[in-house]
Design a protein with these regions (language model features):
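A structural motif corresponding to the C-terminal lobe/cap of the Radical SAM core domain
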Residues: 1-152
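Membrane-proximal basic amphipathic "stem/tether" segments
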Residues: 139-172
Length: 172
């Protein structure tokens, strides 16, 4: 059918964060088995991950990047938790006095707009940037590429990621 790539919202690997985010559907998922199955079908994976959840700590960035590389996730999009207006998350954070900005242009998943619990706002922003730079480092691109079972998938991963790497100046 021509399916070459799939966007998967992993969100977080923390059961506590999944529960507090009402992402109960993710709790019983075997991510590793799903990734292996998709790779066996030749499907590349764009993994999406969220940082800044209430149970995150300073090590969440390294753990997330390491997991993505270990399981040969082709591309990753990292996000800072963003409590969009009109959502339950925003309403709860507003009730708790945690909203720090009402400048809607900052609600972009790259900017911290609330009082974090497990990390400082600066740690969250720095960790988010670290995750991008490390996931897309040449050493990790090669490492993830060679995690595939066959040369065709290894080369596809390597060339696809190399293409992403050339756009790095635009997100720095």
């Amino acid at each position: 059918a021509g399916l070459r790539s799939l966007f998967l919202g992993f969100e977080t690997f923390s059961p506590d964060n999944l529960r507090s985010s009402n992402k109960l559907q993710n709790l019983s998922k075997d991510y590793v088995a799903a990734v292996k199955r998709l790779h066996s079908l030749g499907i590349m994976i764009n993994g999406s991950f969220v940082f800044g959840l209430d149970h995150d700590d300073k090590d969440v960035f390294r753990r997330t990047v390491d997991w993505g590389i270990e399981h040969s996730i082709t591309t990753a999009t990292f996000h800072i938790l963003t409590p969009y207006p009109g959502t339950r998350l925003f309403q709860q954070m507003e009730r708790d006095g945690r909203i720090t900005s009402y400048d809607w242009s900052q609600y972009d998943t790259r900017t911290v707009v609330y009082k974090t619990l497990g990390l400082t706002a600066e740690e969250l922003k720095q960790g988010y940037e670290w995750a991008y730079h490390n996931f897309y480092s040449w050493s990790n691109i090669f490492k993830a590429s060679f995690g595939h079972d066959n040369i065709k998938q290894q080369l596809a991963h390597l060339f696809y990621m190399g293409g992403w790497k050339k756009f790095e100046p635009f997100w720095n």
